[in-house]
Design a protein with these regions (language model features):
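A solvent-exposed interaction/effector surface
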Residues: 1-171
Length: 171
């Protein structure tokens, strides 16, 4: 058994990531555009989406996903989608955003803190990546920069549980 090593950051402590060859995903849900200043409003998007979880036509599994895409650096902004995996897009509500996540290699980080500390974990990951010897996978407008996976162990009431951050990397 390999011992887990902790990597310290001023923002958050990270466990060493595991590496996965992720399958292609179709994600559908609600999305909005955010900036560094407005990203603190993402929980309101989740509150709007929460009643749909388990009720989306064609939903696959019980996990929910937070997908970051269309990132711009000047000025910093990004689209964020709160959604679920679906088998196809044909029956999802018209107000839902749809995004295809390609099959690719990922560095997968566990987030064990309260969900409100996820921005600190993301900042720590983005500081860790350039020093890791890994390179982020190329991305386009509709290709996710990363996604958060909220598994069955995530508790919506407490904001704690099964949360992972999946960062696409070059294989």
């Amino acid at each position: 058994m390999q011992q887990t090593r902790m990597m310290e950051s001023s923002e958050a402590a990270l466990e060493a990531p595991r590496f996965e060859n992720g399958k292609a995903l179709l994600i559908a849900g609600l999305s909005e555009r955010y900036t560094a200043e407005t990203r603190r409003n993402i929980p309101q998007l989740w509150q709007r989406f929460q009643p749909h979880i388990g009720n989306v036509p064609g939903q696959v599994g019980k996990a929910a996903y937070g997908v970051c895409f269309n990132m711009r650096s000047a000025p910093f902004s990004f689209d964020y989608l709160a959604g679920v995996e679906v088998s196809d897009f044909s029956a999802v509500p018209s107000e839902f955003t749809q995004i295809s996540v390609p099959a690719q290699r990922y560095a997968v980080f566990s987030h064990r803190d309260h969900v409100s500390r996820l921005p600190q974990t993301l900042d720590a990951i983005h500081k860790w990546l350039p020093n890791s010897g890994l390179v982020a996978a190329p991305r386009g407008d509709d290709v996710p920069v990363f996604f958060e996976r909220y598994g069955e162990g995530f508790d919506l009431r407490t904001g704690i549980g099964d949360v992972e951050v999946w960062i696409p990397i070059k294989a």
